[in-house]
Amino acid sequence: MAITVGINGFGRIGRLVLRIALSRKDIQIVAINDPFIAPEYASYMFKYDSTHGRYSGEVSHEGENIVIDGKKIRVYQERDPVNIPWGKDGVDYVIDSTGVFKELDSAQKHIDAGAKKVVITAPSSTAPMFVVGVNEDKYTPDLNIISNASCTTNCLAPLAKIINNKFGIEEGLMTTVHSITATQKTVDGPSHKDWRGGRTASGNIIPSSTGAAKAVGKVIPELAGKLTGMSLRVPTVDVSVVDLTVKLLKDATYDEIKAAVKEAAEGPLKGVVGYTEDQVVSSDFLTDNRSSIFDAEAGIWLSPRFVKLIAWYDNEYGYSTRVVDLLEYVASKN
């Protein structure tokens, strides 16, 4: 029996989540809410995508609905989630991809509006975080509001899990070289909390903070306090890369590290982790649905306990795929 789902926030992640969910027979998207996007505009934004290409099916709008491949999806424009009629539409699960309602108190509004469970597509300081392939098995049905963490944590955590399980991680530093996102500026503009973040996105490499590495400690508790990192925003439209430099607890050759990642990518983490020895660049991973693709040729071994590891990720599409995977997992446990 299909689960009924509503999407709050029809931005980059919300639209890609819809694309991916439409390919899953066990998911029925019945409603979308975005206060800034009317049905006609929603259909246009869903149909055309500058990064991932045009939607392959039929898209139109009819009254208060968008129509995708003949199926109507109701569009609401409520600013406050408590006013979205999830209950009336029979919505059991809400994916909140606004980046605004990311804490337990604000996401609770979806429950108050009639939904049963909420998956937040952003890291949260109060909602429990889950990363598919890392700790989703710790989910219990009493948890009504959960977070899918960030795209970078979804790339880093599976790699850290593999390395920590096999060799142990004493400590590490991460840099993510990250594509442009919607919060950045097309030209220099005001950004009071992050002055550098207000500079022209297309013409600069912009250092930024990220909690992605520290968040690994929330999904892998034994790594709490052992990882931290930063972000460098670069002028590419999509696909990012994690540079993880770690001090190991056990001696390892680079070949042993490669073998451990390859074994996981072909076994228990297949579909979540990838492995490549090709001479790849970022655009080779556009619309890749994996969380973390280990670049065996780009890493550096300095000594038996000190290595640099590189992993690619489509920060839009790979992450959105995991959102849907986590939703399905939660539904299977309820």
UniProtKB/Swiss-Prot annotation:
Q: Where is this site: Activates thiol group during catalysis?
A: H178
Catalytic activities = D-glyceraldehyde 3-phosphate + phosphate + NAD(+) = (2R)-3-phospho-glyceroyl phosphate + NADH + H(+)
- Entry-linked Pfam families: Gp_dh_C (PF02800), Gp_dh_N (PF00044)
Q: Where does NAD(+) bind?
A: R12, I13, D34, R79, N315
Query: What does the entry give for GO biological process?
Result: glucose metabolic process; glycolytic process
| Gene3D superfamilies for the chain | Dihydrodipicolinate Reductase, domain 2 (3.30.360.10), NAD(P)-binding Rossmann-like Domain (3.40.50.720)
Q: Subunit info? A: Homotetramer.
Question: What protein does this entry describe?
Answer: Glyceraldehyde-3-phosphate dehydrogenase
Species per Swiss-Prot/TrEMBL record: Wickerhamomyces ciferrii (strain ATCC 14091 / BCRC 22168 / CBS 111 / JCM 3599 / NBRC 0793 / NRRL Y-1031 F-60-10) (Yeast)
